[in-house]
From Swiss-Prot:
Region (Ubiquitin-like (UBL) domain): 10-92
Function of the molecule: Required for maturation of ribosomal RNAs and formation of the large ribosomal subunit.
HAMAP family: WDR12 (MF_03029)
GO biological process: maturation of 5.8S rRNA from tricistronic rRNA transcript (SSU-rRNA, 5.8S rRNA, LSU-rRNA); maturation of LSU-rRNA from tricistronic rRNA transcript (SSU-rRNA, 5.8S rRNA, LSU-rRNA)
Region forming the signal peptide: none
Similarity remark: Belongs to the WD repeat WDR12/YTM1 family.
Protein name: Ribosome biogenesis protein WDR12 homolog
Localization of this protein: Nucleus, Nucleolus; Nucleus, Nucleoplasm
ATP-binding among keywords: no
Keyword Hydrolase: no
């Protein structure tokens, strides 16, 4: 660590929030040309001196961004003086997800959603499919008359599962699944959109769901078995047809993404280059964020309150809906080689998210690492259309190669280790 390669030495303090990996809190003089390789060697040497610890792989954050090259280059890029004492935070490296299963379908898989030990998928052959997260096919469900575009779970317990699907046939359908008998009934057909329904999201309490469509409309529906609409015609009730509770107009192109931010707030993304935050209590737009590309997907994190977008280019972008500057991108993530179709934040890890693109790849990211993903999740043989990390144990994706790919995440890998 004392070799001088012409960049000089830097005074650093090594910090970690993982107390069992803490090293003495004193300044260290290190060469400016070090990378994560040399820093890992140095920190592990300090830990061995402290308590004889075995080697651990770490990542290093300098001014809230992952170090991906030489320390001196990182500091220059951020206009930081070499004479300042630099704080470097180190964190145990997130383990690489491991491929578990490939679930083969008869057509493109355009929608996936995991919950508990089940995976729900939707296809371009108009069918829905239920699988276990161990790869066993449970059920094929017919009902839609055009390709499925989105799915979401409403509720799930040991006896009953309820979920919603949307389709290019201009409808959303509510389903009730008897887990024991493995029988599914369509509870309601939701009609009101005038073009294909591209996106769906169920409210946190499971009582409502929202849909976005090519007709540019956002609609909110009851997700209850009995929607309780007084005055609905007897014919509509008997036929199982359901109409929207709320219709919101504001987008100029397809509403390609929708998500509940909380009980009364919705996020939408559109091909019209905008993100919109809707206040349902006022039935109007609360915030609008202008972007420079058509938005294919958007994801809001309840942990960090930030929004990610997948767009008609190779980049993912990070926005803060709380800012007063509605068009400012907080960060751009570079790594895909084709249009990015789908993105989702982790529901349990504040900084992590996953993406899928037309380059046939899924990627796992840390939002503090804009220059490169943590890992490439390989397996798809064609474009990725949807990705899901609702179940913290599994990253699940569907694509044009007619497959769902299942990857074990850290929580599942940890359980495997404990059971060995």
């Amino acid at each position: 660590m004392d070799v001088d390669n012409g960049e000089g030495q830097v005074q650093v303090h090594l910090k970690t929030k993982q107390e069992h990996y803490a090293v003495p809190d004193v300044p260290y003089a290190i060469d400016g040309t070090v990378t994560t390789v040399e820093l890992n060697t140095f920190v592990n040497a300090l830990l061995r001196q402290k308590d004889g610890s075995s080697d651990t792989e770490f990542d290093f954050l300098v001014f809230d961004e992952y170090l991906r090259g030489r320390l001196c280059d990182h500091l220059r890029e951020k206009a930081i003086s070499f004479e300042d004492a630099i704080e470097i935070e180190y964190v145990e490296r997130f383990p690489a997800p491991e491929p578990q299963d490939c679930l083969l379908h008869d057509d493109w898989v355009s929608a996936v959603k995991a919950r508990g030990k089940w995976i729900l998928s939707g296809c371009y052959d108009n069918s829905l499919n239920l699988w276990t997260n161990k790869g066993k096919h449970i059920l094929t469900i017919s009902g839609h008359t055009a390709p499925i575009k989105a799915v979401d779970w409403i509720s799930l317990d040991e006896e009953t599962g309820r979920f919603v699907s949307t389709s290019q046939d201009q409808t959303a359908m509510l389903w009730k699944w008897n887990v024991g008998s493995n029988a599914v009934d369509c509870v309601s057909v939701c009609k009101g959109h005038e073009r294909g329904v591209d996106s769906v999201s169920v409210s946190p309490d499971g009582l409502r769901f929202a849909t976005g469509s090519w007709d540019t409309m956002l609609k909110v529906w009851s997700a209850e078995l009995d929607d309780g609409v007084e005055g609905s015609s007897k014919r509509m009730k008997e036929s199982g047809v359901r109409t929207p509770k709320i219709t919101l107009q504001g987008h100029r192109e397809s509403v390609s993404a929708v998500q509940w931010m909380d009980a009364t707030t919705l996020l939408t993304g559109s091909w019209d280059y905008t993100l919109k935050v809707w206040d349902l209590s006022l039935e109007g737009i609360k915030t609008e964020i202008s972007t420079n590309k058509s938005i294919f997907d958007a994801s809001y994190s309840k942990l960090n309150r930030l929004i990610l977008t997948a767009s008609a280019d190779k980049n993912l972008r990070l926005y803060d809906p709380r800012t007063n500057q509605g068009s400012v991108v907080r960060n751009t993530y570079l790594g895909h080689n084709a249009w990015v179709q789908t993105v989702m934040w982790s529901t349990t890890e504040e900084f992590l998210f996953v993406s899928g693109a037309y380059d046939n790849q899924n990627k796992l990211w840390d939002c503090r690492s804009p220059k490169a993903p943590l890992y490439d999740l390989l397996g798809h043989g064609d474009k990725v259309l949807d990705i899901d990390w609702s179940n913290p144990k599994y990253i699940v994706s569907g694509g044009v190669d007619n497959s769902v790919r299942v990857f074990k995440s850290r929580k599942a890998l940890a359980e495997d280790t404990e059971t060995k």
